[in-house]
A protein has these predicted regions:
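Basic/polar phosphate-binding segments, predominantly the helix-turn-helix DNA-binding elements
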Residues: 148-177, 199-221
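A short, Lys/Arg-enriched amphipathic alpha-helix from helix-turn-helix/homeodomain DNA-binding modules
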Residues: 110-147, 151-154, 175-194
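N-terminal regulatory/effector-sensing and dimerization cores
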Residues: 2-91
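Residues that scaffold the ATP/ADP-binding catalytic core of kinase and kinase-like folds
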Residues: 85-87, 176, 225
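Helix-turn-helix/homeodomain-like alpha-helical modules used for DNA recognition
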Residues: 1-3, 12-24, 207-228, 233-235
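Terminal helix-turn-helix DNA-binding modules in bacterial transcription factors
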Residues: 168-205, 227-235
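Short, Lys/Arg-enriched N-terminal segment that forms or immediately precedes the first helix
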Residues: 14-18, 117-124, 162-170
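Aromatic/histidine-rich interaction motifs
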Residues: 88-109
């Protein structure tokens, strides 16, 4: 089973983990994974070996699974909530990071370090701007439960919203809202709430719906994939 520690901020997460079992999955977040003590195996849309001491960037919406079980990995996750004005290319092939980028990832020791590294990474990656009408919505998404509500807050027609969200995030509005729902649910779980509390906070119909969505987006269920982690919430 998975174990380790998770540092969770707004739009980002840093996970130091011993790999457990998971299923191939993809998500809205971009993932950068560093092989700590032995080679890392990436399977899914692309089958790759990441040598120990190297890191790989897996773009959003790329189907993947990490291995082998028992290996140590440090993974950084970045999504549009970290910096609402920027977006990275979705669906591109995984790429190895430069030695400088890899060293910076390995040196992160605090929330401030993590946010600084993420900002530098976005700057180097030539992240492109998200439509300005969505920036305010992404900064305070808690009251949004439907694509219609998202369109109303952003002052967009439903059809225009679909065009913009698909262009900027690579998913339809409903999928973006599901990702935001999952984040709210996980934050509640991290804060000490039970599965029922987490499901309610995320706007899921019930615990099983939350569990299925977690497996779909993260490759693990809450009980199997998150229960053995120590969490730190970073403001």
């Amino acid at each position: 089973s998975w174990s380790g520690s998770i540092m969770l901020g707004t739009g980002w997460a840093l996970i130091d983990a011993r790999i457990g079992s998971s299923r191939p999955h993809n998500h809205v977040a971009h993932q950068i994974s560093l092989a700590i003590e032995r080679d890392l195996e990436i399977s899914g849309d692309a089958d790759l070996i990441v040598p120990a001491g190297h890191a790989i960037a897996i773009a959003s919406h790329v189907r993947h699974r990490l291995g082998p079980p028992g290996a140590l990995v440090r993974s950084f996750y970045l999504d549009p909530l970290f910096r609402a004005g920027t977006r990275l290319s979705a669906g591109s092939a995984p790429v190895l990071l430069t030695p400088i980028e890899t060293a910076g990832l390995g040196d992160i020791a605090s929330g401030a370090d993590a946010k600084r590294w993420a900002s530098d990474y976005l700057d180097r990656s030539q992240a492109r701007p998200v439509d300005a009408r969505l920036s305010e919505v992404l900064a305070a998404p808690d009251d949004l439960s439907t694509a219609r509500a998202l369109a109303d807050v952003a002052c967009l027609s439903p059809s225009r919203l679909r065009e913009i969200v698909s262009r900027d995030f690579g998913v339809p509005p409903a999928k973006l809202l599901q990702w935001l729902q999952l984040q709210r649910a996980v934050r509640t779980l991290v804060g000490g709430g039970g599965l029922a509390d987490a499901a309610a906070a995320g706007g899921f119909a019930d615990q099983s719906h939350f569990t299925r969505r977690c497996a779909q987006w993260l490759g693990v269920t809450p009980s199997a994939g998150l229960s053995a982690f120590a969490f730190e919430i970073v403001p």
